[in-house]
């Protein structure tokens, strides 16, 4: 386990630099990022989970539509829906999928002007390039970047994250309660 532990210890040291770079990247690209109405995040291998987490955080915090795809799967049908309001973010871990992540970012840049690569060397100056230092814990290195993106986006679009949220109170959300299930399927309105 020693090699894994040594690899894991690299991650916290990289977080400060990644966070600082993410804040600067967001400031430089804020207009383009805010102008999007849909965010599509791509990641290969362990970065697929980061793409999913990033999409979830954008929806939770910034109240914008977002979806995360596995890099290979997302390069087919979903690209047919891209338009000038679609922001595409490809996560590049510098390993498996790196070439496709760069290609995805490049394609989105030329199609909508809202394509970005996070991690690795990037494609151009609008990308968030950083050194990926871990082999087996890359996802932990990328997590702060997508979390900061969601947070900064929420600030830019005016979402008050300190305001309490009340989840919808509808019968649908009580589906695990047997009486609610009975009333829904029987047509009874309680």
Task: Enumerate the language-model features and the residues they cover.
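A SIS-like phosphosugar-recognition module
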Residues: 1-190
């Amino acid at each position: 386990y020693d090699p894994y532990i040594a690899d894991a210890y690299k991650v916290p040291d990289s977080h400060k630099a990644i966070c600082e770079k993410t804040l600067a990247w967001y400031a430089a690209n804020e207009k383009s990022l805010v102008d999007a109405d849909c965010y599509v995040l791509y990641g290969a291998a362990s970065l697929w989970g980061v793409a999913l987490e990033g999409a979830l955080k954008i929806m939770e915090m910034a109240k914008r539509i977002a979806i995360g795809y596995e890099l290979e799967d997302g390069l087919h049908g979903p690209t047919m829906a891209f338009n000038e309001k679609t922001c595409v973010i490809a996560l590049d871990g510098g390993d498996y999928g790196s070439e496709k992540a760069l290609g995805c970012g490049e394609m989105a840049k030329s199609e909508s002007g809202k394509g970005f690569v996070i991690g690795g060397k990037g494609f151009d100056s609008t990308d968030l390039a950083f050194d990926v230092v871990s082999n087996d814990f890359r996802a932990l290195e990328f997590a702060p970047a997508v979390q900061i993106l969601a947070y900064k986006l929420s600030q830019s679009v005016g979402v008050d994250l300190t305001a309490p949220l009340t989840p919808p109170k509808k019968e649908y959300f009580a589906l695990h309660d047997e009486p609610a299930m009975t009333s829904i399927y029987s047509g009874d309105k309680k």
